[in-house]
Amino acid sequence: MKLGVFVNEFKTVVETVDRLTAEKLGLIFIQNGVFHATIKENGKSSPLLDKTANFYVLAEDLATRGLTDADVDNRVKVVNYGDVVDLIFNDYEKIVWL
Amino acid sequence: MSMIDLAFIIQRPPYKSETSTLGLTHAISYQVVDMFLDDGQGVIPKVCFIGEGVFNCISEHKSMENYGVTSIESHVKNSLLVDLDMYVCKEDIDRFGIPENRLVDAEDMGADKKLQIVPFSEIQNILNNSKHIFIF
């Protein structure tokens, strides 16, 4: 299964995402999920970034919160709304929203 | 004069819900609450950002461009402009690696007040000394 997961919270979703497995897993950080791509709590990146997955973060949601590409972990690709549509239609068979 | 201390604690991150905005607009409304009070009474609101709430204080929001809504940054600046005392938990900005120079500043609008970065112990004192505590 090729599974795309929209992560839209910072704290409450880590356990759930941690249990997900897929042949191809994509984590798309949106809304307050963008902090997973940018914040280093106690100097450590989000544990979600340790998963075997493709990581994306929505540029518009970064900018809204005063964050820039320079704040983003280098494992995460910055994408725009158009790119997200392409991911949904071309890269993943199933999409879930956490 | 009888003054009542109010503490507004903002602990939720910005935008996904209205929670942070509501906390700020409630605090700002102290300016008009006098009309409901007796002569000689007043309120002194203090806004404290703790936990993920400190994410609200990162500057340069682009919410109008992307969401079409007034930014929380604007609400923070307006709050400073009307001389609200606003506190940011130092332990939390340190924990999340947010440099102090990334925080909202309303100096460009002519505000005298600034976000005050304080240890949680000071926020605890604010809680202890407030008659009412509102958590957002």
Regions found by a protein language model. Give the residues of each.
Chain B
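Short, glycine-rich nucleotide/cofactor-binding loops
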Residues: F8-T25, C57-N66
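Low-complexity intrinsically disordered segments
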Residues: I93-D94, D108-K131
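Trp/Phe/Arg-rich N-terminal binding region typifying the photolyase-homology
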Residues: V33-D34, G51, I72
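Short internal beta-strands
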Residues: I44-G53, L84-D92
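A glycine-rich helix N-cap at a beta->alpha junction
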Residues: S63-I93
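Extreme N-terminal starter segment of soluble prokaryotic enzymes
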Residues: S2-A7
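Short, basic, glycine/proline-bearing loop/turn elements
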Residues: F55-K62, D105-G110
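Histidine-anchored nucleotide/phosphate-binding helix
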Residues: S20-G42, V47
